A protein has these predicted regions:
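Cytochrome P450
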Residues: 1-402
Length: 402
């Protein structure tokens, strides 16, 4: 989920009504993971209220479909948790969404050879990827693919990305409406992803489809209409990645993600589930952040004409504008952890074994850390001062690409 908030000017009547509605709710009823809050814009007021009144907030089972969890909404608390993997473990968890059930696991991964006990064990382990591992496994998995987005490799890719961006922009229609997200944001991102995975360019939109399905719940109007369609797509991605990795092991090493996983000295010990998990992280991370940042930059510059004029007058602000866009729209709303012991944070004790959501999107609006945090200002003194890429050992691997 991503979030777009209005400029921090006087509130409209509709915004005032929405804010009053959120502030009238019992504090315990607030559930930042409620997807309905995001398209409506209500999430702005949910986080504003939580930062002010209950920055370490507990959502009970009766108020969420995801099961009970804690929310950290202030910058300092998020940073404290994100940099303390001893107390806040990433093992087997990425978001506050309920783990996949054994039935859902079987629908995707069981080729007829898995026993019921193996399916149960896989479901109990939860997610296995470089995002959902603690040391030492985390370092091993991150090291296997990090070279693909190293500064040196990205420098080699830069001319190609620039050439493609120019060609896409030159092909846009003049004097008529068009879908910027589809024709520019998705297209350039899909082309780049296909290069990073060494996947056929003519099939690049398949990568976009898989990413969309992997990051959304099934339902009418969603990337997958139902659970069966979602399971089929995830199974298709799993099979494709497995076949690509096995094929690359017999080929000369290259710098794409799949080849790096195939030839890493550590990857011979990776399970198929771990290769799939790492591939999912790389696919979704490379798709969401880049695509949404391209789209958000156009949206924000259009809605903030004074910032647009500032950028036109001084193109040297482009790097700062990109960082501010990433902060303001926060492509990844949150990451989750599980406490390994009772942990006191900001005066509250979170019991051992509880799930904790670090809401980056709220921390990026924390007025105690960022002046005029709800405004879009492309020439901030420290534009990279944001939470969008996380902190600590799990800081976004592809932040330089974004």
């Amino acid at each position: 989920m991503t979030i777009a908030l209005s400029r921090d000017t006087e509130l409209t009547a509709e915004q005032t009504e929405a804010r009053d509605r959120i502030y009238a709710l019992p504090l315990a009823a607030l559930n930042p993971a409620n997807p309905a809050h995001y398209p409506s814009g209500d999430i702005r007021w949910v986080f504003e209220r939580l930062r002010a009144e209950d920055p370490v907030h507990f959502t009970s089972d009766e108020n969420t479909e995801h099961g009970p969890y804690w929310s950290l909404t202030r910058w300092a608390d998020i940073q404290a948790a994100d940099t303390n993997h001893d107390a806040f473990s990433a093992e087997g968890i990425i978001t506050v969404a309920r783990p996949r059930t054994p039935e859902q696991i079987a629908a995707v991964f069981n080729d007829g050879t898995m026993t019921p006990e193996e399916i149960e064990a896989r479901a109990a382990r939860g997610s296995r990827s470089l995002l959902s591992m603690d040391p030492p496994d985390h370092e091993i998995h991150r090291g296997a693919v990090s070279e693909g987005v190293s500064p040196a490799n990205l420098a080699m890719l830069e001319p190609l990305i620039r050439e493609r961006a120019g060609a896409i922009l030159d092909s846009l229609p003049i004097g008529e409406e068009f879908d910027w997200v589809d024709k520019v944001s998705i297209e350039l991102t899909a082309m780049t992803l296909a290069t990073l995975f060494d996947y056929p360019q003519e099939k690049r939109r398949q990568l976009t489809r898989w990413s969309n399905i992997l990051t959304s719940l099934p339902g009418p109007g969603m990337a997958a209409e139902n659970e069966e369609e979602r399971a089929a797509a995830v199974r298709e991605f799993f099979t494709t990645i497995s076949e690509m990795v096995n094929r690359r092991r017999d080929e000369e090493p290259r710098m794409d993600f799949v080849s790096l996983m195939a030839h890493s000295p550590h990857s011979k010990d990776f399970t198929e589930a771990e290769i799939f998990g790492d591939s999912t992280v790389l696919l979704v991370g490379g798709n969401d952040t880049t695509r949404n940042t391209i789209s958000a930059s156009v949206y924000l510059l259009h809605n903030n004409p004074e910032q647009n004029e500032k950028l036109r007058a001084n193109p040297a602000l482009i790097p700062s504008m990109v960082s501010e866009t990433i902060r303001w729209q926060t492509p990844l709303t949150h990451m989750a952890r599980r406490t390994t012991r009772d942990v006191e944070i900001n005066g509250k004790v979170i019991p051992k074994g509880d799930r904790v959501a670090m809401w980056y999107v709220s921390g990026n609006r924390d007025e105690t850390k960022i002046e005029n945090a709800t405004e879009y200002i492309i020439d901030r003194k420290n534009p990279r001062h944001h939470l969008s890429f996380g902190f600590g050992i799990h800081r976004c691997l592809g932040n330089k690409l974004a």
